[in-house]
């Protein structure tokens, strides 16, 4: 999406995730040395929790430098997605401040069948399927939206 946020319909999400993940689930990506340790620190937080507000992820992960870019990279690769919004609470449990994004692995938001449905295809095949789907919108430069 040219470095910007975007929306992907659920009927395209399997191929989109397969393309952006280059055919890897996160553990395999990390084991092959293609994901930094900061990404692993963040993803490990979701082993026991379904969604976590972004400010808590920063505190729990212990990542000081490069936190925002680590989260952005995980979102671009479709390993994390915004699952909702929450607000901080004061000592009296009253909400205050701006809404804050809660992040989750998309498998927990949309279901594993939707997210991993194209894992049997190569990333190149997923790209071809997405380009075919976007072809009617080609005048808008739509296929350029597929590259990270």
Role assignments for model-derived ranges:
Residues 1-148:
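Long, low-complexity intrinsically disordered regions
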């Amino acid at each position: 999406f040219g470095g910007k946020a975007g929306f992907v319909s659920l009927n395209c999400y399997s191929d989109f995730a397969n393309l952006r993940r280059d055919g890897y689930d996160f553990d395999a990506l990390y084991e092959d040395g293609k994901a930094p340790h900061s990404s692993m620190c963040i993803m490990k937080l979701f082993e026991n929790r379904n969604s976590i507000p972004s400010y808590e992820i920063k505190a729990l992960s212990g990542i000081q430098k490069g936190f925002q870019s680590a989260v952005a990279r995980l979102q671009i690769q479709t390993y994390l997605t915004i699952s909702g919004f929450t607000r901080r609470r004061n000592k009296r449990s009253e909400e205050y401040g701006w809404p804050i994004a809660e992040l989750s692995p998309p498998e927990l938001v949309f279901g594993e069948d939707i997210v991993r449905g194209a894992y049997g295809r190569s990333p190149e095949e997923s790209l071809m399927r997405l380009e075919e789907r976007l072809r009617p919108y080609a005048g808008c430069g739509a296929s350029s939206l597929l590259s990270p």
